[in-house]
Amino acid sequence: CACLVGSEMCIRDRDMGVPAATEFLDTITPQYIADLITWGAIGARTTESQVHRELASGLSMPVGFKNGTSGSLQIAVDAIVSSSCPHCFLSVTKQGVSAIVSTTGNKSCHLILRGSSLGPNFDEEHVKEAVAALQKSGINNRIMIDCSHGNSCKDYRKQPAVAANIAEQISNGSDQVVAVMIESNIVEGAQPLSSDLVYGKSITDQCIGWETTEEVLETLAAAVRRRRAKRQEA
């Protein structure tokens, strides 16, 4: 089954020392794979969903909530606040038996800026606006930025430019941005699902290729080194 295949993949990643992350889409699957996941995401279209907020409240990992597709930050802020509190919801036990699950709340949830139908929101001005909204609600003000989706205007080739802007913010001393999300694969682009697939090429969203990914990661790493050097000088 799909859960078994996913678990086997996560175990292989773990054995190589690579932490696994995923987007959680329902309240059942996590019971089978959550112990193998290091970080989780709730997508823009489900951030407003009460059951996903309840789910996040019981996950033993940091969970990122994306801003809404309309650009609304408040939807994600409300989700983070809600998920920090205890909840009860219908799910299954680890043995697959239907049960009422009780949670203690997840204080490690955070915001993901992913852009919107109105345009990108990765620049310094939008980051400051997001931090202010998070601080006003008294919650974690550290932010992840999605280099794809609305922030790339759905053009995967623009992801390096988005990452370069984020790197500049980091180089200038910003510590609000703690992570980025990149749609990346071995081979750039995407392909339709067929019987003749190219290994390492996405069958969903278009991705940057591995060489470009390495360049983006080095740009971000260099920015972190510059920020660290500035702090040591101060």
What are these regions (language model features)?
Residues S116, M144-I203, C207-E211, E215, ...:
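Catalytic-face loop-and-helix region of soluble metabolic enzyme cores
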Residues E8, I33-I37, H52, A132-K136:
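Catalytic-site microenvironment of enzymes
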Residues C1-G6, C10-I11:
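Single conserved hydrophobic/aromatic residue that forms the stacking wall/gate
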Residues A41-T93:
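Loop-centered beta-sheet repeat module
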Residues R12-V18, G58-L59, N106, A133-N140, ...:
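A structural motif corresponding to the C-terminal end of an alpha-helix
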